[in-house]
Amino acid sequence: MKKAFGVVILFVGLLDVARAAAESPPPQFDAKAAERFAKLALACVAKEYPNKISHVLNSDADVAPPRKLTPAFSGCYDWHSSVHGHWLLVRLLRTFPNASFAAQAREALRKSLSAENLKQEAAYLRGEGRASFERPYGLSWLLRLGAELREWDDDQAREMSANLRPLEDMAIERLKAWLPKLSHPVRIGEHDQTAFGLGLMLDYARTTKNDSFARLVSDAARKFFLSDKDCPLNYEPSGEDFLSPCLGEADVMRRVLTQVEFTKWLTDFMPQIPMTGNPPSHGPGAASGDWLKPVVSPDPSDPKLAHLDGLNLSRAWMLEGILSALPQDDRRRAALQAAAEAHRTAGLAAVTGAHYEGGHWLGSFAVYLTTQRGIQKEGTTSQKKNGASEKAGP
């Protein structure tokens, strides 16, 4: 009986935390916040241990420390977190070029993204039995890093981009060979989710004007998701999710459909989004985000249970992405905005660095959200050719 009572108290306590987070004003993103996130990445990109290797051994020669196997991306606990930890530093240097962390971030990037290190990374990927290595999650983040470097008008960035290019090209070839063979999408809330990977791939293809890759990715998204209806959002989340299967799907489809197409598709796909209410800041009668409430990790020190802290962040950016593709007079905007703000507040509050289990990756999710990286405002010809949303901004 005491045990059951304790569980009830814990559950109520978690609800109170989520409710308080949802009612707080959204945190300001400025140079101070950027420094906090940069410190998380700087603390891990060169931190080799602890390390979780996803590694196929072909012989005794493959038994080696991470710094020998993948010298560019041997920190931050695992390969994909190291990749997006480096992306975080590039993104923040572009956003705050004169910040206090700039010199340290540049030096960390210089050491990691050297030509020699990245040649070794490419050799590792070519190893026998590694065709599925970090596919699609890590490879998609690698493309996000590559695109960020290409967009940065900076001499060091151009050098690092050239160093990364062979690995980048290898990732594209891997994904181009894999996507046509993928018979069904992977609809989970973790690394293998197809929708999230497709979104990163498509953003890369459009940034780099790789039209053939953009068409392949857009066609895959349409094949997998265009006929979907009534996504069971009430079944989310699973206990170890850091991505939303339903929102992730909507977030990639707003990239490949026109505004008119997406507005109709979303009605069929997520009919549970409330249709009434004023924006959250408009006083009495304002829309509530209660239709999709933030979650709380029951144990941020557990590497899997800490995923729920990241779920709040990714839900927030996916909700904002959906908003960016809807007409200004769409009656769902207020409810979407309310839910996005609640998740943003709860998600950013959890990015503390108190536990390495979350500290090695949550900063990247926070920066992806706060810099609106997933909402590309450049209406390029490549985007229009491949069915980009007609409306670029939120």
Residue ranges and their predicted role:
Residues E23-S74:
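Low-complexity, Ser/Thr/Pro/Gly-enriched N-terminal "stalk/linker" regions
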Residues P26-A31, P66-V83, A123-S140, K181-T194, ...:
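Solvent-exposed loop and edge beta-strand segments that line ligand/cofactor-binding
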Residues G6-D16:
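Bacterial N-terminal signal peptides
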Residues R206-H282, A286-W361:
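Long, repeat-rich segments with strong aromatic
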Residues V17-A21:
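Sec/Tat signal peptide C-region and signal peptidase I cleavage site
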Residues S24-F29, K39-A43, V83-A99, S140-Q156, ...:
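Well-ordered alpha-helical scaffold segments within catalytic/enzyme domains
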Residues K68, V83, V90-T208:
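Extended ligand-binding groove/face enriched in aromatic
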